[in-house]
Amino acid sequence: MPAMSTSKPPSRDAPHARRKGARMRRLAWLLLFPACAVNAQVGTRATQPAVPDAAPFGSSTVTVVKPGEMVPPRVAPACKPGSCPFTGQTVTILLPKSLIAVPVLELKDEFEAATGASLKIVQVASLDLFDNFYSDVANGVGKYDALLASAWWLGELVAGDYVIPYDKYYQSPRFPKWNINEVLPAPRSLLSYGGKKYMVANDHDGQVMYYRRDLLADPQHQKAFRQKYGYALGVPRTWAEFRDVAAYFNGRDLTGDGAVGHGLTIALKAGNQGMFHFMSLSAPFVIGPTNPRLYWFDPQNMRPLIESPGHVRALEVLVDLVQFGPREMLGWESGKSWDYFLAGRAALTFTWGDLGALAQQEGSKVKGKVGVAPLPGNKEYFSLAQAKWARGDTPNRVGNTTGGSWAGVISRYSRSPEATYFLLALMATKEKSTVYAARGWDGLDPGRSFHFLPPDGSAKIDDYLKASWDETDVRDYLHAYFETFSNPLQLPYLRIPGTYSYLQALNLHLAEAVGGQVSPREALKATAVNFEEITLRIGRDAQRRAYRASLGLQ
């Protein structure tokens, strides 16, 4: 999501901050006429447009911090003249104009020296990324060998037979070695589709909760909170506790400068990322021990499940939380919301890993004060498998891989598939990935065992301290992601043909609900209607097969 120039403040949102011409008009049309617009997109040549990292519909750059500098080491030795494995070949990779593309730029010279091949890098506006690649493969042109893709495009690409698996290259000693089993279970599941490996590990997205550690530890706040709510102020374990903490801090001076702060901040701009926040929040209201899979559709018949009692209650919770944030956040993209937290103006938020890394950079007002934890749970969930509410002895907490999880895929029409895999595998090596995760500003988030500190993993604290992390902040941050990605209960990841249309339908009706135009129940009922229309337009049987394959079902 960040801008491509490393001289600009880092944010994975920056590349889609601007939309021009026909695309801006298309978005305006979508916002004005959500139901018909969603239907109109289905059945066109591409149902999922380009998106930068976690934010498919555009966002703004973070402005209050500056990136640090940390360069990954060279891994592949230069080949000797006459023995270079891919002499004369050219690998063309399609990338977004974003900081998330910087790692590819960094290894260009190393790749060419190690292989004898040439690396051609094509960068386009993030909104054009998917369309450019899709047009190429749909017409069998083969202009691009690889694409840095969002994980939720994979269903579209596999269904069209537009990308190839790399299973036959993975074990070969001819290529840089990386270990897929070092990727934690949840993000690892996104690398394969239908039992075959397609995406080479790179970025590992998921949402966690951020809180002001200094505020929760303040004795005066602890005393006042207990007097008001009857229990100890602490890290929220449930969304009900999250609400209490947000309500308590709302309207207080959180920075000592006399300015009024807010209990929370969430990016809820219409047509942007609100559906991602809802998905993560809603997971423990729907997913649970007796219902580990049913969230989006019934895999037997592709009937939408989005208007279940659990989904409705979760949206009611989100709508209620809005009152504890700045009203302007209804028009904010992630960058704006992150800025607000980085400036010390909010006590709580939940979002992607970018924020934890950005909090350590120059300009942040909260470095050394940022607590991080897995998202809160709920005391009960509506088990769609049993059609009833279920309650356990402890809060039901669910992990997530919400976001883009950017990774390379190989085009079916690549003329140099082996050289292409060499490039992607080189970027996936432990030596490279360790630096990407530690520096943070490149938008490549942790998700592999060597990213995490003992006892969770094998990382060294010095790697993070050299990248300017506060030690307490980074220990919280990494452990929160380890728990999130290791949780056996996960929000099912939607990655089938038409994903963009489904998410856009949810997004637009969600905006109506948080804006007070319709009730949560009405918003999700309308979403379910759109989901059914989209499925019918694409084809129920084809969607059922794709959905089951995406879940690993036979």
Language model regions located:
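Hinge/lid segment of periplasmic solute-binding proteins
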Residues: 45-85, 151-210, 277, 373, ...
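Short helix-initiation/N-cap motifs at beta->coil->alpha
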Residues: 124-132, 237-241, 329-343
